[in-house]
Protein backbone atom coordinates (compact mmCIF):
# COMPACT_ATOMS: atom_id res chain seq x y z
CA UNK A 1 0.00 0.00 0.00
CA UNK A 2 1.73 3.17 -1.20
CA UNK A 3 -1.14 5.65 -1.64
CA UNK A 4 -4.13 6.89 0.33
CA UNK A 5 -6.38 5.68 -2.49
CA UNK A 6 -5.07 2.15 -2.04
CA UNK A 7 -5.66 2.45 1.71
CA UNK A 8 -9.28 3.45 1.06
CA UNK A 9 -9.70 0.35 -1.10
CA UNK A 10 -8.27 -1.87 1.65
CA UNK A 11 -10.61 -0.32 4.22
CA UNK A 12 -13.61 -0.85 1.95
CA UNK A 13 -12.66 -4.47 1.30
CA UNK A 14 -12.14 -5.20 5.00
CA UNK A 15 -15.49 -3.63 5.86
CA UNK A 16 -17.32 -5.52 3.12
CA UNK A 17 -15.83 -8.93 3.90
CA UNK A 18 -15.28 -8.62 7.63
CA UNK A 19 -11.61 -9.30 7.03
CA UNK A 20 -8.76 -8.54 9.42
CA UNK A 21 -5.99 -6.39 7.93
CA UNK A 22 -2.99 -6.62 10.21
CA UNK A 23 0.64 -5.58 9.78
CA UNK A 24 3.57 -7.09 11.61
CA UNK A 25 5.17 -3.87 12.84
CA UNK A 26 8.31 -5.81 13.59
CA UNK A 27 10.11 -3.03 15.46
CA UNK A 28 7.43 -3.44 18.12
CA UNK A 29 6.01 -6.93 17.72
CA UNK A 30 9.33 -8.74 17.23
CA UNK A 31 11.38 -6.87 19.84
CA UNK A 32 11.16 -8.20 23.42
CA UNK A 33 12.54 -4.91 24.75
CA UNK A 34 9.39 -3.14 23.57
CA UNK A 35 7.22 -5.60 25.47
CA UNK A 36 9.27 -4.96 28.61
CA UNK A 37 9.03 -1.19 28.15
CA UNK A 38 5.25 -1.42 27.92
CA UNK A 39 5.21 -3.41 31.16
CA UNK A 40 7.40 -0.83 32.91
CA UNK A 41 5.11 1.98 31.79
CA UNK A 42 2.05 0.07 32.98
CA UNK A 43 3.77 -0.24 36.37
CA UNK A 44 4.05 3.56 36.52
CA UNK A 45 7.84 3.61 36.41
CA UNK A 46 8.09 6.83 34.35
CA UNK A 47 4.70 8.47 34.91
CA UNK A 48 2.59 9.59 31.97
CA UNK A 49 4.22 9.21 28.55
CA UNK A 50 4.46 12.56 26.76
CA UNK A 51 6.98 11.98 23.96
CA UNK A 52 8.69 9.29 21.92
CA UNK A 53 11.86 9.59 19.85
CA UNK A 54 12.14 6.72 17.39
CA UNK A 55 15.32 6.13 15.39
CA UNK A 56 15.30 3.57 12.59
CA UNK A 57 18.65 3.41 10.81
CA UNK A 58 19.15 0.60 8.28
CA UNK A 59 22.06 -0.76 6.23
CA UNK A 60 21.64 -0.27 2.50
CA UNK A 61 23.25 -3.57 1.39
CA UNK A 62 23.12 -2.33 -2.18
CA UNK A 63 24.10 -5.61 -3.95
CA UNK A 64 21.10 -7.40 -2.43
CA UNK A 65 18.48 -4.86 -3.50
CA UNK A 66 16.19 -5.40 -6.51
CA UNK A 67 15.63 -2.66 -9.07
CA UNK A 68 12.27 -1.62 -7.58
CA UNK A 69 14.00 -0.73 -4.32
CA UNK A 70 15.43 2.34 -6.06
CA UNK A 71 12.11 3.39 -7.65
CA UNK A 72 10.06 5.63 -5.38
CA UNK A 73 6.83 4.91 -7.24
CA UNK A 74 7.20 1.20 -6.51
CA UNK A 75 8.41 1.13 -2.89
CA UNK A 76 6.42 4.14 -1.72
CA UNK A 77 9.17 6.19 -0.09
CA UNK A 78 11.17 5.88 3.10
CA UNK A 79 8.45 7.23 5.40
CA UNK A 80 5.85 4.79 4.09
CA UNK A 81 8.41 1.99 4.30
CA UNK A 82 10.40 2.40 7.52
CA UNK A 83 8.83 5.27 9.48
CA UNK A 84 5.48 3.49 9.70
CA UNK A 85 7.07 1.31 12.41
CA UNK A 86 7.95 4.37 14.47
CA UNK A 87 4.50 5.89 14.00
CA UNK A 88 3.03 2.67 15.35
CA UNK A 89 5.17 2.95 18.47
CA UNK A 90 4.29 6.62 18.98
CA UNK A 91 0.56 5.93 18.91
CA UNK A 92 0.92 2.85 21.09
CA UNK A 93 3.07 4.32 23.83
CA UNK A 94 1.28 7.68 24.03
CA UNK A 95 -2.13 6.01 23.96
CA UNK A 96 -3.16 8.07 20.93
CA UNK A 97 -5.92 7.18 18.48
CA UNK A 98 -4.94 9.91 16.03
CA UNK A 99 -2.13 12.38 15.40
CA UNK A 100 -1.16 15.38 13.29
CA UNK A 101 1.89 15.45 11.04
CA UNK A 102 3.56 18.73 12.00
CA UNK A 103 6.34 18.37 9.44
CA UNK A 104 8.07 15.71 7.38
CA UNK A 105 11.16 15.56 5.19
CA UNK A 106 12.67 13.05 2.78
CA UNK A 107 16.08 13.34 1.19
CA UNK A 108 18.82 11.71 -0.83
CA UNK A 109 22.10 12.88 0.67
CA UNK A 110 24.42 9.95 -0.03
CA UNK A 111 23.29 8.26 -3.27
CA UNK A 112 23.11 10.92 -5.99
CA UNK A 113 23.17 8.38 -8.83
CA UNK A 114 19.94 6.82 -7.53
CA UNK A 115 17.52 9.73 -7.61
CA UNK A 116 14.57 7.47 -6.83
CA UNK A 117 16.05 6.38 -3.50
CA UNK A 118 15.18 8.28 -0.35
CA UNK A 119 18.04 7.53 2.03
CA UNK A 120 16.92 9.87 4.85
CA UNK A 121 13.59 10.82 6.35
CA UNK A 122 12.14 12.47 9.43
CA UNK A 123 8.74 13.25 10.91
CA UNK A 124 7.50 15.50 13.71
CA UNK A 125 4.04 14.59 14.94
CA UNK A 126 1.73 15.36 17.84
CA UNK A 127 -1.51 14.21 19.36
CA UNK A 128 -3.67 15.21 22.30
CA UNK A 129 -1.52 12.89 24.44
CA UNK A 130 2.03 13.70 23.38
CA UNK A 131 4.61 14.50 20.74
CA UNK A 132 6.93 12.40 18.64
CA UNK A 133 10.07 12.67 16.55
CA UNK A 134 11.09 10.05 14.00
CA UNK A 135 14.32 9.68 12.04
CA UNK A 136 14.96 6.90 9.54
CA UNK A 137 17.84 6.36 7.13
CA UNK A 138 19.89 3.94 5.02
CA UNK A 139 23.25 4.99 6.47
CA UNK A 140 24.25 2.16 8.85
CA UNK A 141 28.04 1.85 8.46
CA UNK A 142 29.68 -1.51 7.85
CA UNK A 143 31.51 -1.31 11.17
CA UNK A 144 28.28 -1.91 13.10
CA UNK A 145 27.78 -5.65 13.77
CA UNK A 146 24.10 -5.57 12.81
CA UNK A 147 21.83 -3.96 10.22
CA UNK A 148 20.89 -0.95 12.35
CA UNK A 149 21.22 0.71 15.75
CA UNK A 150 17.48 0.98 16.28
CA UNK A 151 16.54 2.99 19.34
CA UNK A 152 13.44 4.27 21.08
CA UNK A 153 13.37 6.84 23.87
CA UNK A 154 10.10 7.14 25.78
CA UNK A 155 9.80 10.28 27.89
CA UNK A 156 7.43 10.32 30.84
CA UNK A 157 6.53 12.94 33.40
CA UNK A 158 8.53 11.09 36.06
CA UNK A 159 11.37 9.52 34.09
CA UNK A 160 12.34 7.99 30.78
CA UNK A 161 13.13 4.67 29.12
CA UNK A 162 15.67 4.09 26.37
CA UNK A 163 15.64 0.96 24.24
CA UNK A 164 18.72 -0.14 22.34
CA UNK A 165 16.97 -2.84 20.38
CA UNK A 166 19.56 -4.59 18.25
CA UNK A 167 22.96 -3.56 19.59
CA UNK A 168 24.52 -1.59 22.43
CA UNK A 169 27.39 0.47 21.07
CA UNK A 170 28.58 0.96 24.67
CA UNK A 171 29.74 -2.66 24.62
CA UNK A 172 27.07 -4.85 26.22
CA UNK A 173 26.65 -8.06 24.28
CA UNK A 174 23.43 -9.16 22.66
CA UNK A 175 20.19 -7.32 21.95
CA UNK A 176 17.12 -5.90 23.74
CA UNK A 177 18.84 -3.48 26.11
CA UNK A 178 16.50 -1.38 28.27
CA UNK A 179 17.55 1.58 30.42
CA UNK A 180 15.09 3.02 32.95
CA UNK A 181 15.68 6.31 34.75
CA UNK A 182 13.30 7.79 37.32
CA UNK A 183 13.32 9.44 40.74
CA UNK A 184 14.48 6.27 42.46
CA UNK A 185 17.12 4.73 40.21
CA UNK A 186 19.02 4.46 36.95
CA UNK A 187 18.57 0.81 35.97
CA UNK A 188 19.70 -1.48 33.15
CA UNK A 189 17.48 -4.41 32.14
CA UNK A 190 18.29 -7.21 29.70
CA UNK A 191 14.87 -7.80 28.16
CA UNK A 192 15.75 -10.71 25.89
CA UNK A 193 13.35 -13.04 27.67
CA UNK A 194 10.29 -10.77 27.46
CA UNK A 195 7.27 -12.17 25.62
CA UNK A 196 6.30 -11.61 21.98
CA UNK A 197 2.52 -12.12 22.02
CA UNK A 198 1.53 -10.61 18.65
CA UNK A 199 1.42 -13.74 16.50
CA UNK A 200 -0.39 -15.89 19.05
CA UNK A 201 -2.91 -13.12 19.59
CA UNK A 202 -3.36 -12.66 15.84
CA UNK A 203 -4.20 -16.35 15.42
CA UNK A 204 -6.72 -15.95 18.24
CA UNK A 205 -8.20 -12.94 16.46
CA UNK A 206 -8.54 -14.80 13.16
CA UNK A 207 -10.31 -17.70 14.85
CA UNK A 208 -12.54 -15.67 17.18
CA UNK A 209 -12.85 -12.40 15.16
CA UNK A 210 -11.46 -10.32 18.01
CA UNK A 211 -8.88 -7.50 18.10
CA UNK A 212 -6.39 -8.52 20.77
CA UNK A 213 -3.20 -8.37 18.69
CA UNK A 214 -3.84 -4.85 17.38
CA UNK A 215 -7.03 -2.82 16.96
CA UNK A 216 -8.02 -2.53 13.30
CA UNK A 217 -8.43 1.24 13.62
CA UNK A 218 -4.86 1.50 14.96
CA UNK A 219 -3.43 -0.37 11.99
CA UNK A 220 -5.27 1.79 9.47
CA UNK A 221 -4.32 4.98 11.34
CA UNK A 222 -0.62 4.11 11.23
CA UNK A 223 -0.88 3.55 7.48
CA UNK A 224 -2.80 6.80 6.99
CA UNK A 225 -0.29 8.90 8.94
CA UNK A 226 2.70 7.35 7.17
CA UNK A 227 1.14 7.98 3.77
CA UNK A 228 0.23 11.57 4.68
CA UNK A 229 3.73 12.25 6.01
CA UNK A 230 5.18 10.85 2.79
CA UNK A 231 2.85 12.84 0.54
CA UNK A 232 3.50 16.20 2.22
CA UNK A 233 7.23 15.76 2.86
CA UNK A 234 9.72 18.44 1.92
CA UNK A 235 12.19 16.94 -0.58
CA UNK A 236 15.92 17.62 -0.26
CA UNK A 237 19.15 16.49 -1.90
CA UNK A 238 19.44 14.44 -5.08
CA UNK A 239 15.84 13.26 -5.35
CA UNK A 240 13.98 13.06 -8.63
CA UNK A 241 11.08 15.47 -9.06
CA UNK A 242 7.51 14.21 -8.70
Language model feature labels by segment:
Residues 6-11, 20, 201-242:
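C-terminal helix-rich "cap/oligomerization" subdomain common to oxidoreductases
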Residues 22-29, 43-64, 78, 82-86, ...:
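NAD(P)-dependent dehydrogenases' Rossmann-like dinucleotide-binding region
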Residues 88-169, 199-208:
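Contiguous beta-strand/loop segments that form the cofactor/metal-binding neighborhood of enzyme cores
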Residues 1-29, 44:
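Beta-strand-loop-alpha-helix segment that lines the small-molecule cofactor/substrate pocket
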Residues 189-200:
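Active-site loop of classical SDR/Rossmann-like NAD(P)-dependent oxidoreductases
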Residues 66-74, 179-184:
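Short glycine/proline- and charge-enriched loop/turn segments
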Amino acid sequence: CTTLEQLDSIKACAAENGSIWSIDFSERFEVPAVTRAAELIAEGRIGKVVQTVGLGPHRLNRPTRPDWFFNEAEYGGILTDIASHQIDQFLFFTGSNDAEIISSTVANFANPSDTGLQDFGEINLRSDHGLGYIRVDWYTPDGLPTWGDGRLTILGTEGYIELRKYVDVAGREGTNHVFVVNGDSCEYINATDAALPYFEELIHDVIHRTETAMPQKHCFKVMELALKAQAQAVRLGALSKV
